[in-house]
Structures are given as structure tokens and as C-alpha cells.
Amino acid sequence: MDSTTSAVATAALTPTELDTLVHAAAEIEGWAAGSHVWGHYAEQTDHGPAICRTENVSACRPDVRALVDGPLRAIATAHLGTDANAFKDKINYKQPGGAGFLPHQDRHAYPDAPDLVSLLVAIDACTEASGCLWIAPGVDHLLPTDDRGVVEAHVTDALDWEMVELAPGDALVIDGWLPHWSDANRTDAARRVLVASYAPAGSGYTRDGYYSKRAAEMAASTAADGRFRISTHADFAGEEVAPEHRAEGACSHA
């Protein structure tokens, strides 16, 4: 695996830290079942509507923030070669039957960001059957995309893809250039991951700034075509379910 674009940090979390994350994810999912506020997103599956994402998790969870700003930040700092600052975090749940994402590069979603790196931390085992990531290392430039922000098919077909399976507590570290995609979850259990994204500290790319801009972009995209999205680009392969409310910085689960 090309260390300039990706790396796997085996046992990125200690058993105690992983237990903390597992407990937090379960509790947050329980909050989502009773409320549509605080950045919860749902998708339609063959089993009915299911939660697929919660954004800005550490805004309401000091235990998750301690992981994002502690051991995970240390990994991001080592990869960036300078002090890292978290500007975004989310949990992707990928419930049974949950959809994956089409081939894309994160850099397209953050065109004004400086160098960035994201850590995808496995809460559950990420396997081929449960929809782990496929990556194409070695890319150091933006690839052409269609109007959804998805890498064009003829480019995708020419890339050398590698499957990355993770054990709980492992982390896949990726930069903004790395093309990646994932398949649907074909198992009978969730495939949850925490994704934390970092930029160099002092770069001006901050959590508040990112989520303010995201809210405006999401509202504009919905107004333009009437489609509710879970991402700023339309690279989600599933069918989103629009919530009654969305407030990613509201820090409320009541």
C-alpha cells in the first residue's frame, strides 16, 4: 500500500478506547431512533428505513472527542507531518442492506482545504461482505468526475483497486487524493465506522467553519434539485430518506 496516500494503523485504539467508541455508537444510534435532530441521516433499505450516518458526533460526545483529539489526532499528525486539527467527524453505520459509496476523491468535497487526511476507524469488522473500502493508491491529482462528483467510469475502470479489510479498532488513513469506494453491506450485522478528518493546525480550516459551509451547500443542493443528500456530492449509492429536521451543530438528542 502506497504510504503517500494511505496506510492501515493496526490497533489504532486500545481495547478500552474501542469499548468507549462501541458504547458511544450504540447510544447515539439509540438517540437517533427517537429523534430526527442532531445530524442523523437515514436511508431506505430492503428492510425499511435505517440510520446510515450521524455527523459532528464529538460536538455532543466528550468521550468521542477525546478519541478524535487524542490517539486519532496523533496518527493524523504523523501522516501530515505537522500538527493536525479535526474539522469533521461522523459515524457511518452501514446497517444490513445499507448502501455503499461510488468511486470518489475526498478532495472534490473540500476544494478550498489545505492538505487533509481522514481516519476511517472500524467499530465493527470491515470485510468484503460487509462493504469495506476499496482504494486505488498512488493518485496525486484530481480525477475527472461526472456531475455527481463521482469519478468517471472510464477512469475508474483503469485504476488498480485494492480491498482493505479492517478489524475493530484498526484505522485506514487516507488523504484527499485517494480514490475509494465501497459496496453494500450483505451481512446481517451493521458495519459501523468512525470517520475523523483533519487539516494542518493553524490553516484556518475549522470545525465551525466546515459545518457552517456544509449546511449552506446542503440547503442549496436540495433547493436546486429537490433531492435530500447525506453528502455534499451525490456519491452515495443508496436512497436517502429526508428527516423532519437536521441540525448538525444543535447538540440535542431530546
What do these predicted regions represent?
Residues L142-P179, D183-A254:
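Conserved double-stranded beta-helix
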Residues M1-T4, V8-P103, A109-Y110:
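Non-heme Fe(II)-dependent double-stranded beta-helix
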Residues A7, A50, D89, L116, ...:
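A short glycine-rich, His/Asp/Glu-containing loop-to-beta-strand
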Residues D89-I91, L119-V121, L194-Y198:
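A structural signal for short, well-ordered beta-strand segments
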Residues G98-M163, S203-K213:
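Catalytic core of non-heme Fe(II) oxygenases with the double-stranded beta-helix
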Residues L13-P15, N92-K94, H108, C126, ...:
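Short, solvent-exposed loop/turn segments at secondary-structure junctions
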Residues A9, L119-V121, L172-I174:
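Short hydrophobic-aromatic micro-motifs
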